[in-house]
């Protein structure tokens, strides 16, 4: 038993179990508790066999993948062309978002000792999430969930874990009149968002196409599901509250592999917990429905337009704003990182 196991066991063992039996028995109890919560790793004999992983791949329609960090190229040859390409890509948040081995916190969270998840299920539908949750539970694997990859605690990825990567689950549906399942509330405008959508996609759909506003975050590459579950303070929070306050309903897969609907009437405790309790804490969210608001008449716009390898005369601010708003949302091939942040006009 090492010091880590003793500390974990101490935290997980009720205080009453430490009273009476003496230090030897208490230490053994702590060790047992630590072993109970220890996840299976590749070096353990209980690690799933190749046949087991193949079955999971079949259950998810071929969406299981082994996760390999592109930073491995820098460990082999720090000055080689492959490593230079990786560093060039790391300047672009879209490059990071499209690789399950990277997160938006890679630069300052164990960057040079990157240990991504062992495998990832690139989920396309709720059934893929159910299969991954059941597989992780049955095999005692650590499970992580990655949407936008902005977890500042590094929980978007973990070594020797199974990742549920929701990037492809980004359908967005606008509702003129939405009523949560089983509720008697009057209908209201809303938007249903897949767990893998980022705010840039949502703002484009809701504001540009729908003429409405949805309370979200100021950074366009942040994932919707993670921000809402973390509370979600944004540009208009003084007017509309947090992103979590706009949540009307969520579909979530809990640890028992059951798909549940959470709203004010159905599973209200779970609904309460999802609004700020932390991403992936109570299950894996597959979609969310958020309240939308009337689009404000006046906006204050802050524009970040970073370009790599681009030279020439910088145009005046007004032309830069007009040109940026006319361009497509993402131009990763040009090394461009652009963010629009809107706030109350004052």
Please provide the spans of the model-predicted regions:
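C-terminal cap/substrate-recognition region of VAO/PCMH-type FAD-linked oxidoreductases
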Residues: 42-46, 198, 212, 241, ...
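Glycine-rich N-terminal segment of FAD-binding domains in flavoprotein oxidoreductases
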Residues: 76-81, 121-169
